[in-house]
């Protein structure tokens, strides 16, 4: 089957449909008469996507995203795909890549935030009253450039969802599709009666790593020949693969919404008490109590629960959302913190002077008036862990790039895309909100998925006030808090102790039956 035929099978008139979806959502956010910076970015992306012939590949993800959001959960797209404004408007990314700005949901008044600090994001700024209607304007925008990060032909998407079955059902219903179960993959055949309806058990669904929209012509029979090499399918013109992972965070946040009645869309990005949790755990307690740990309050907070993240967080002391994004990147990259950024911070460099994201490398050079093409090539060289060339070093010296920054570039092995860090920082923020404001619901929901081991039951039965010494004896906590001998078991024991010290009833089994 020719790609254009397959594109029509997935979505007829995909260019037109994707454009309508994006323009409608942009109009809802920014008014029908789009501000110039919004219109310019959207048009540039849509033209690029249409020219690449991949508009139809956005539609299945849009279908999945709508279904996931209808359940009260969210979808997270991995990698640089999340940087596209089109992805944001389709709902398959929660990251608005535009420059920092305010927009009013009531009258659609929009203001660009005048900042020359390329690392700042909209969430760093306080709420502002709309000069037109007097309503509250919301800050937004993560300042992610477009062209280097949007790839033309994408045979595969990687997403995190609360449940793989939701993805399968959404596509099955929309396309009136049959399904064939393969080895860790479900093949969905649009408009086909050649296969039975999907009825695999939950264990099979959890083990999935791919869902494939496949042309019935490709199959050509009532049962799929699994001898097809994965690479052959991926390079085919008539297959779309969706790599899926069942995300524990999405499941946990869905559970917390059910328990508290507060959804993630109701959580403010301007809560100073939440940012304080990433500096100290004192705010978790109602009295003047000084906690046992002397550490930050991020036990149980994804991406910030382990000692390496603590070490970075304590070194940089985050006080705004962009700081959290950088911490995630420093923790996730290779060769960006130890023997690199950590040393520079100790020497007095600012968090946002050091390398954390690949986009920041390019934006830093652009701020130094380096040509766009040169800035892009240097960024590509650094992010792939390659040392800068002599020509690049001469160019950087000529542009006034300090030697310490050039040396830092050459120490990098792998640096993260900003979209990944933003997505993780947002999840951490949401979880921190629930932990601070709904402690019982947070600890209950968290441990609901962790309490299978008998040690938790033993902890609950034998807990008594001020048992921190017992914990140290159990898992050598003194060494653990020196960042040695740390694992998830130790973390969960500390979390249980924290819950008890905050007055939370540890009898989780009576809270959740079945």
Annotate each predicted stretch with a short phrase.
Residues 1-514:
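Noncatalytic, beta-rich nucleic-acid-contacting surfaces in large DNA/RNA-processing enzymes
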């Amino acid at each position: 089957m020719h790609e254009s035929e397959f594109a029509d099978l997935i979505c007829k008139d995909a260019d037109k449909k994707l454009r309508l979806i994006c323009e409608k959502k942009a109009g809802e956010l920014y008014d029908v008469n789009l501000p110039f910076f919004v219109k310019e970015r959207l048009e540039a992306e849509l033209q690029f996507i249409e020219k690449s012939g991949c508009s139809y590949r956005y539609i299945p993800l849009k279908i999945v995203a709508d279904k996931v959001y209808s359940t009260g959960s969210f979808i997270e797209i991995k990698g640089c795909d999340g940087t596209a404004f089109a992805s944001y408007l389709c709902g398959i990314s929660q990251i608005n890549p535009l420059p920092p700005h305010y927009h009013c949901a009531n009258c659609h008044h929009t203001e660009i935030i005048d900042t020359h600090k390329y690392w700042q994001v909209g969430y760093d700024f306080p709420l502002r009253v709309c000069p037109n209607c007097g309503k509250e304007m919301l800050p937004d925008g993560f300042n992610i450039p477009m062209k280097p990060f949007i790839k033309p032909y994408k045979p595969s998407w990687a997403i995190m969802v609360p449940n793989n079955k939701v993805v399968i059902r959404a596509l099955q219903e929309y396309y009136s599709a049959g399904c064939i179960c393969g080895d860790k993959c479900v093949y969905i055949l649009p408009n086909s009666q050649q296969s039975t309806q999907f009825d695999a058990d939950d264990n099979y669904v959890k083990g999935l790593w791919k869902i494939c929209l496949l042309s019935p012509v490709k199959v050509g029979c009532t049962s799929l020949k699994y001898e097809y090499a994965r690479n052959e399918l991926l390079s085919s013109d008539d297959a779309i693969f969706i790599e899926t992972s069942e995300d524990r965070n999405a499941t946990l946040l869905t559970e917390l919404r059910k328990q508290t009645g507060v959804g993630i869309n109701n959580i403010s990005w301007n809560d100073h008490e939440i940012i304080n949790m990433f500096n100290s755990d004192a705010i978790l307690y109602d009295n003047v109590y000084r906690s046992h740990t002397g550490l930050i309050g991020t036990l149980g907070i994804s991406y910030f629960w382990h000692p390496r993240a603590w070490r970075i967080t304590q070194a940089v002391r985050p006080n705004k959302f962009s700081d959290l994004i950088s911490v995630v990147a420093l923790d996730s990259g290779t060769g960006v913190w130890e023997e690199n950024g950590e040393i520079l911070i100790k020497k007095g460099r600012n968090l946002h002077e050091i390398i954390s994201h690949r986009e920041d490398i390019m934006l830093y050079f652009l701020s130094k008036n380096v040509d766009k093409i040169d800035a892009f090539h240097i960024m590509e060289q650094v992010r792939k862990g390659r040392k800068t060339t002599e020509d690049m070093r001469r160019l950087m010296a000529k542009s006034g790039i300090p030697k310490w920054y050039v040396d830092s570039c050459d120490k990098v092995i792998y640096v993260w895309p900003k979209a990944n860090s933003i997505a993780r920082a947002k999840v951490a923020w949401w979880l921190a909100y629930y932990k601070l404001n709904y402690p019982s619901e947070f600890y209950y929901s968290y441990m609901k998925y962790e309490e299978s081991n008998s040690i938790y039951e033993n902890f609950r039965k034998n807990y008594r006030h001020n048992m921190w010494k017992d914990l140290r004896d159990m898992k050598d906590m003194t060494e653990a808090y020196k960042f040695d001998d740390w694992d998830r078991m130790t973390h969960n024991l500390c979390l249980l102790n924290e819950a008890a010290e905050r007055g939370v009833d540890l009898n989780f089994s009576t809270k959740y039956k079945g």
